[in-house]
A protein has these predicted regions:
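Membrane-interface alpha helices of multi-pass inner-membrane proteins
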Residues: 176-203
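Transmembrane alpha-helix segments characteristic
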Residues: 25, 127-135, 222-230, 307-336
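Beta-sheet-rich sandwich/jelly-roll-like modules and their strand-loop junctions
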Residues: 462-523, 531-558, 562-611
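Hydrophobic alpha-helical membrane-interfacial segments at the cytosolic entry of transmembrane helices
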Residues: 213-234, 317, 389-390
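Aromatic- and kink-enriched transmembrane "portal" helix at the membrane-lumen/periplasm boundary
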Residues: 125-159
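Membrane-interface transmembrane helices that cradle and orient dolichyl/undecaprenyl
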Residues: 160-177
Length: 611
């Protein structure tokens, strides 16, 4: 590849052209995610509403983030997503920041690894960089791009890549092992594949030990970490998801397909839509078989270097071991999971970990060419020119697949538009709810909480306000345990969603306690909504908004807002009362003041209607 370039341009220009070309996949991913991102809660990601609602209602417990889900304890994923949701009112668009950081952070690790193994001042580096870039940003893993929940996989990949970078390039430095162990813990408590990284590192270091039969000190360190992490992870975990498991042949077919999908998909992109799972496994199975054969051949060549703990050899063994463990473990659970069977190995999301088998060989071959381990006479198939030609063929095929893959991102874009339209006001089920989540009760709970808390697709919506007319200010009434204040009003429109009123603090800094409010439709036994306001946090004459469940047909209906407090008048929050005017509504009713029965006072109340 560089040989052809050098006949037209100088080697230096060719070098930088290839480096620039390596940035194209990264830019492609940026545009692809921006165009195709699902920007509303979808499928398993909707379960985050339970933690968000608990946080808003004051019922959140940190221990709940530890709960298992699909053979994982996604503590890191839940923590990051919850904190982001709290900060942004669950604006799903903001979650892609963390997805970008994970993917580009992983690329930074792989670039640094290429610099350590190959160096920058040679023609092999840009070829290696281009190959790695095409694999990492590959649209074959599109499922990990257009859905923010796949931050779980992307973050795990980053933590694993960082761990491998540290321990394989500096295998004798304890500080690197400590940082890598922390990173592996984070990976394990994001997705189960983090445990496979523990095992891959242990095996690699034990194979590279001076005496194979004697435990290596670094391997022992990682074994201890694995055991402690497992002791924290496994209790209470339901590991069985299916009563049937694959046969040896099915497991082999799945694993080969899983390992070959990253390469096979780049040679010829197989997906036609975002949810399609190709049924044919032939191409990926062949690619997986070829990669295993080449890995075995390279491993034999690398074994003497592994005993010396050469970084390239350790990368080859560690990457391959991790990919194989991921393939077999996933196949054990998924090869007979549903009607797709072993074709589940073609799943787009799995390629993120299956690609390590290919990446390890790319790095090892690159290091071998730079350091001249193979003479062209003895290893003609691995001669520099042959490798560059193969890399050029791979790059051309991959760029074609990148172009063909845009249809998947376009499909995701259209799906997101349709999905967003499903989030209409109200709780009446619509046929499109099945796209949000397969369980109707889960969709109903999700929409109810989102509308009540005004989160996600129901956040920052436009509201129509109607303010009750009042006269001049008369006096405050104390919201203490001594009285209840009731105000009736008639809704002027459909879609009642908010009530706004003002409080005063006649007791100043002494204000404490809680104000309890409840809204009911007159004549109904069940309240529409209720809540608490911390009196100590209220500001003098500041507007307080009470959020309600969306009321579809509210126009013309009469509602009653009841307010009460705790404690004594001397520490209570105040509610300003006004003289009525001709167009004022019904007067307030004070439980301890008979004069109010004669219409002496009204409260200022603003009703807001969602549209």
């Amino acid at each position: 590849m560089t040989g052809r370039l050098s006949s037209v341009v100088s080697p230096k220009v060719g070098y930088w052209l290839l480096v620039a070309l390596s940035a194209v996949p990264a830019v492609y991913l940026l545009f692809a995610v921006q165009y195709s991102a699902i920007t509303v809660p979808f499928w398993d990601h909707t379960e985050l509403i339970h933690w968000i609602a608990d946080w808003r209602e004051g019922n959140f417990h940190v221990s709940s983030l530890w709960a298992p889900h699909n053979h994982t304890r996604p503590l890191v994923y839940r923590l990051v997503m919850l904190m982001n949701a709290v900060a942004t009112d669950w604006d799903v668009r903001s979650e892609y920041i963390y997805l970008y950081l994970s993917i580009y952070g992983t690329f930074a690790c792989f670039v640094w690894l290429a610099r350590r193994l190959i160096g920058e001042a040679n023609a092999v580096f840009p070829v290696t960089l281009l190959s790695v870039s095409l694999i990492l940003f590959s649209p074959v893993g599109h499922n990990n791009h257009w859905w923010s929940m796949m931050f779980q996989l992307d973050a795990t990949n980053f933590f694993i890549a960082l761990s491998f970078l540290l321990v394989f390039t500096r295998p004798e430095i304890w500080s690197c092992h400590v940082v890598a162990a922390v990173s592996c813990w984070l990976a394990a408590f994001t997705l189960t594949n983090g445990f496979f990284a523990f095992v891959a590192i242990i095996i690699t270091f034990q194979l590279s030990a001076t005496k194979f039969t004697r435990p290596d000190r670094f391997a022992v360190f990682w074994v201890i970490n694995l055991l402690v992490a497992s002791a924290c992870y496994l209790p209470g975990m339901q590991m069985e998801s299916s009563s049937t498991h694959p046969s040896a042949l099915e497991l082999l077919e799945f694993s080969l397909t899983y390992l070959g999908a990253p390469l096979g998909g780049l040679l010829w992109f197989p997906y036609r839509s975002m949810f399609q799972l190709p049924m044919s496994i032939a191409v990926n199975l062949i690619c997986g078989s070829i990669l295993l054969v080449t890995c075995a051949a390279l491993s034999l060549d690398a074994l003497p270097r592994l005993r010396k703990r050469h970084p390239a050899a350790m990368v080859l063994f560690g990457f391959a071991g991790f990919a194989m463990l991921s393939a077999v473990a996933t196949g054990w659970a998924r090869a007979t999971f549903d009607e797709y069977g072993v074709a589940n190995g073609n799943a787009s999301r799995y390629t993120i970990f299956g690609s390590y088998l290919l990446l390890g060989q790319v790095y090892y071959v690159g290091a071998a060419l730079v350091q001249g381990w193979w003479g062209e006479q003895a290893h003609s198939i691995l001669a520099r020119r042959v490798v560059f030609v193969l890399a050029g063929f791979f790059a051309c095929a991959a760029f074609v697949s990148y172009g063909r893959a845009w249809r998947v991102y376009a499909d995701a874009h259209e799906f997101n538009r349709s999905l967003a339209q499903t989030y209409v006001w109200g709780l009446d089920p619509v046929p499109e709810d099945r796209f949000i989540h397969p369980r109707p009760e889960a969709v109903a709970y999700l929409k109810r909480q989102l509308q009540l808390l005004e989160l996600g697709p129901y956040g920052n919506r436009a509201y129509v306000k109607a303010q009750s007319p009042v006269g001049s200010f008369s006096k405050p009434v104390y919201l203490s345990a001594a009285r209840t204040v009731r105000q009736r009003f008639v809704a002027t429109d459909d879609g009642l969603k908010r009530l706004s009123l003002k409080f005063v603090t006649p007791n100043g800094k002494a204000t404490t306690g809680v104000v309890r409010w409840q809204l009911s439709e007159v004549g109904s036994q069940e309240p529409l909504a209720r809540g608490d306001v911390e009196a100590g946090g209220a500001r003098d004459w500041a507007t307080m908004t009470l959020r309600l469940p969306y009321v579809v047909a509210s126009r013309g209906r009469t509602y009653e807002l009841a307010l009460s407090g705790t404690g004594e008048d001397s520490t209570a929050l105040g509610l300003p009362l006004y003289e009525p005017v001709e167009s004022s509504g019904q007067p307030v009713l004070l439980s301890d003041d008979g004069d109010a029965q004669h219409g002496r006072f009204v409260m200022e109340l603003t009703t807001e209607y969602a549209k």
